[in-house]
Curated annotation (Swiss-Prot):
The chain crosses the membrane at residues 51-68, 81-101. This is Distal membrane-arm assembly complex protein 1. Residues 1-40 are annotated as: Disordered. The gene is Dmac1. Residues 1-11 have a biased composition (Polar residues).
Length: 111
C-alpha cells in the first residue's frame, strides 16, 4: 500500500510576477462580472417534469401528515413531535402544489 510518487518532495515558492498592472484612474462603467447565461426555457416548460415532481411531493407530504394523524384517531394526545411531523407533512405537500402551479413562472416574465 505504498505510493507511486517518485519525485522530489521539496517545493519552491513561485517567483512573483514582474508585470505590474496599474489601476486606471477612471474605472470602466460596466461591471467586470459577465452577465449570467440565459437558462434553457425547456426546463421551465417541462410539464411532465413538473407533474411528476409536484405530485410526488404532494403525495409524500400527504403520507407524512396522515401517518402523524394516525395516533390522534386512536385518542392519543398529540405531543410536540406529532405536531412537528404534521407541520412538515403540510409543508412538503404545499411545496408540491407550488411546483405544480408554478406561480413564479406565470407572474414574472422570463427574460
Amino acid at each position: 500500500m505504498g505510493s507511486s510518487f517518485s519525485g522530489s518532495t521539496e517545493f519552491s515558492a513561485p517567483a512573483p510576477p514582474t508585470v505590474s498592472t496599474a489601476v486606471p484612474a477612471n474605472p470602466p462603467a460596466k461591471s467586470a462580472v459577465p452577465a449570467s447565461p440565459a437558462r434553457d426555457p425547456e426546463l421551465k416548460t417541462c410539464w411532465s417534469c413538473r407533474v411528476l415532481s409536484g405530485s410526488t411531493l404532494f403525495g409524500a407530504g400527504t403520507y407524512v401528515y396522515l401517518v402523524a394523524r394516525r395516533p390522534l384517531k386512536q385518542g392519543i394526545p398529540p405531543g410536540p413531535g406529532t405536531v412537528l411531523q404534521m407541520v412538515i407533512g403540510i409543508s412538503i405537500a404545499c411545496w408540491g402544489v407550488v411546483v405544480l402551479v408554478d406561480p413564479k413562472g406565470k407572474s414574472h416574465p422570463v427574460i
